[in-house]
Amino acid sequence: MSEMVDLKEFLAELGKTQKELKNVIEQAKDIGLELKTNSKMTPEEANKLYKYIVEGIKEQIQANQPAKNPEQDNKDDLNTAVASKPLNKKVSKTPKKEEKSQPKPKKTKEKKKEAPTPIAKKKGGIEIVNTFENQTPPVENNPKVVSHSQIEKAKQKLQEIQKSREALNKLTQSNANNAKKEISEVKKQEQEIKRHENIKRRTGFRVIKRNDEVENESENSVTESKKPTQSAAAIFEDIKKEWQEKDKQEAKKAKKPSKPKATPTAKNNKSHKIDFSDARDFKGNDIYDDETDEILLFDLHEQDNFNKEEEEKEIRQNINDRVRVQRKNPWMNESGIKRQSKKKRAFRNDNSQKVIQSAIAIPEEVRVYEFAQKANLNLADVIKTLFNLGLMVTKNDFLDKDSIEILAEEFHLEISVQNTLEEFEVEEVLEGVKKERPPVVTIMGHVDHGKTSLLDKIRDKRVAHTEAGGITQHIGAYMVEKNGKWVSFIDTPGHEAFSQMRNRGAQVTDIAVIVIAADDGVKQQTIEALEHAKAANVPVIFAMNKMDKPNVNPDKLKAECAELGYNPVDWGGEHEFIPVSAKTGDGIDNLLETILIQADIMELKAIEEGSARAVVLEGSVEKGRGAVATVIVQSGTLSVGDSFFAETAFGKVRTMTDDQGKSIQNLKPSMVALITGLSEVPPAGSVLIGVENDSIARLQAQKRATYLRQKALSKSTKVSFDELSEMVANKELKNIPVVIKADTQGSLEAIKNSLLELNNEEVAIQVIHSGVGGITENDLSLVSSSDHAVILGFNIRPTGNVKNKAKEYNVSIKTYTVIYALIEEMRSLLLGLMSPIIEEEHTGQAEVRETFNIPKVGTIAGCVVSDGVIARGIKARLIRDGVVVHTGEILSLKRFKDDVKEVSKGYECGIMLDNYNEIKVGDVFETYKEIHKKRTL
């Protein structure tokens, strides 16, 4: 007798709950099976009820159904399966998968001892058993129509299957004893598996497949040697190990702070996802081996849907991540809300660590936002740091070298400051043969010590007489030939206003000749010239001029130079002291020979091939020729027709003239000439670079002009807290707006620097505009709105139209030919605007001996003059116990009853102050006068 199936076990295999028990009982009534809550049923009844619930195949159960022939059962099952097969199941070409047969009762009994497994489908020796709890019955589909030929083929196949079953029964009987012993072990393993399935379960089917018996006897003998129960136990063991590995992985994941996922057992849904590969990890197992007794078949259709859901979920996650990155919205973060400040702080720290690893190349003058970009810093942090340091800047302001170093220290950066001019200059050609070049000699010294006169004597010219005031106010360059060798001389001004000119001359020179008057000695500009030469690291030769005068003392001059660290050769030093006379010409040849010897020692050489590189010594505007510049070539060759640029000026060389007024075609290293063809007057000291064509020259000049314009705008807006407070406090600050026009760039620069040095806390000169050339109407319009504006012209004269416009605008134009006069007049103008210095002069002192209160008059103090003279109307301080209690004027002074103008020391007098009566005995009167003195600049 077969073992009865309990209704509760049946519900567990169907995946039904106790709440759905009534539905199952009603469905059992539909097929003629009366059930109650604790009822039991036979395996045949359970099989038919399972078919009806799961597949919708309705088979009526009769009350005392007689036993049927197995062959007849197989035929009936086949007909039923063919007639009721759902439309969604495709009919296979092989009759093995179309027919259904019922296993022998003995095997079924053994299986029921393991677990209640109602039979769902039977296909040619294959039993499909539902082993999952959450399985829902599929929707019943309309049956397909099957042809008679297919039925006949199925019947033939059924006979073959019957033969296989007979052989299988023999094998089962022989192994029955061994199977009973292993059933208990299999049950324990199955219970362990069910425990894991209750934790994590996916919908699916477990298909128990019996091996088909091979038609030939040799294959049948091999099949008989197999033990199905042993194969099942091995599979259970593998599954157990896999679940243990899964538990370990889940335990590791549980340690991470992630959202806990709900297990399928916690849900009472009627529909569930089917996930075989992820839940049981069957991908790595060969479960489709024909020799195994128990395999799993997957519902691939459901798996595809699951994969699509996973792909859609991944796509949505990617879109959310992209939106979150673009918007930087913390609410888009699915992992939870995080503080935005923490992200910024971590990001900034990472950048700082990257920056520290290598040095950053920063231009010498860089804008604030450019510094932030190069240093990979936040612009707001840079501006905030400068603000805390007392510097108010915007992102477009330029930073000087000191500010860059401060920022580098604040942000712990390693920087290397680069020269700003390097990107605008063309690299010097290194290839080529270096040839000997003439020495460049700069003549420097104090004003009126005879520098230009000495050079005139060397050149046999008289340039000093052509200079206004007999002093040099422009830098001059000349070429002199001596013994077949050329020497280039640069004459620099000696006046203190031309310090920049002397500095430029020292930068381009090879040898410096310091001219000192033997009758005057070392002066201030002499020391300055020596400092320029020392900074340029060039050898110095001293020329002791005016040796023709009587009572000169060259030893005194040498001693003064020795105190400065320049010892003569005849005193054991390194410097040559040559006595010369610019008036008589004595010592000129000796001076030239000394210069040539020094040049031979230095071995001066330069490359003549390639693009020219020259230095602008002076620039001016000449009538008929436009902007001109005096240049000295350092390397390469400058020829007529060459394109060039110098700072903001560019052009093509039209003509070149030497110091003798002769036209030349080529200018080689150490040669000087006056060139024309410039777009504007280049700044003195700028570097002239030869380029291939006009386009490159124009582009480089425009880049430099843009840079300088932005730099000027930045400097005009940049102000510190200290300067701002001074501007607020000094509301009475007086400015004199001026426009400066000069004939040359060097003179213009000297005038500007000299005037700016006159500025002080009370008055200042504001240079609105400066330029080289004549005074124009545009210059007048710049200062027409100011009451005290002045236009200063140096070595230029205004035209008739300009004079008329100046009268119309009420603008003062002043012209000068000597820089002394210009600076002194501007100094006097500033002094007139400044308030005088007030000094006090003590005049007398008197002690109060008695006080008299007179009605309608006031208090009169009876005093004795102890020092000086007390005068009427003079200012006095009333001192009590060493503290000044009142300051005012003496309104009345009497000697007894008479009014007097003053009282001398030792006499008594009566003193009454203006509007003050709180005088007490013992007070002291101290009188004084205020003296106004003019300030000096």
Swiss-Prot record:
Give the residue ranges for region: G4: 545-548
Q: Where is this region: G2?
A: 470-474
Q: Which UniProt keywords apply?
A: Cytoplasm, GTP-binding, Initiation factor, Nucleotide-binding, Protein biosynthesis
Composition skew (Basic residues), residue ranges: 197-208
Q: Which CDD domains does the record associate with it?
A: IF2_eIF5B, IF2_mtIF2_II, mtIF2_IVc
* Entries under Pfam families matching the protein: EF-G_D2, GTP_EFTU, IF-2, IF2_N
Q: According to its UniProt record, where is this protein located?
A: Cytoplasm
| Gene Ontology annotations for the cellular component aspect, listed alphabetically | cytosol
> Which ranges carry the tr-type G domain?
436-605
Q: Which HAMAP family match?
A: IF_2_B (MF_00100_B)
Summary of the function given for this chain in its UniProt record? One of the essential components for the initiation of protein synthesis. Protects formylmethionyl-tRNA from spontaneous hydrolysis and promotes its binding to the 30S ribosomal subunits. Also involved in the hydrolysis of GTP during the formation of the 70S ribosomal complex.
Q: What is this protein called?
A: Translation initiation factor IF-2
Tell me the organism. Helicobacter pylori (strain G27)
Gene name, please? infB
